[in-house]
């Protein structure tokens, strides 16, 4: 199942699949939704970024000291730390780093 959208309503996040059908509902106390791709989504709770799969199952907790969240795409997300943009996968493995423009 691919994620097409995630909507926040009354203490819950509704996860919709590629056909626009509600696939899963999870409580919003998991954290503040930062973004999603078709494969996973990321929330911030306290001093951690938590990644979740399309079924709402936690993949990994990653400390926020890696940088400030910028964007998410496919199975990767980007954070900005100082003058660098670092790319991580959903499991918290750093893939690449480059100077931000």
List where the protein language model places each region.
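Surface-exposed loop/turn elements that mediate protein-protein interactions on large endomembrane-trafficking
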Residues: 10-27, 49-64, 87-101
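An anionic, turn-rich surface loop/hairpin at beta-sheet edges
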Residues: 31-32, 58-73
């Amino acid at each position: 199942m691919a994620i097409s959208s995630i909507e926040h309503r009354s203490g819950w996040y509704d996860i919709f699949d590629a056909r626009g059908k509600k696939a899963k509902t999870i409580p919003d106390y998991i954290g503040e939704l930062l973004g999603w791709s078709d494969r996973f989504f990321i929330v911030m709770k306290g001093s951690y970024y938590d990644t979740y799969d399309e079924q709402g199952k936690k993949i990994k907790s990653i400390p926020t000291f890696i940088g400030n969240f910028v964007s998410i795409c496919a199975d990767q997300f980007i954070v900005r730390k100082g003058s660098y943009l670092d790319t991580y996968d959903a499991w918290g493995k750093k893939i690449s780093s480059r100077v931000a423009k």
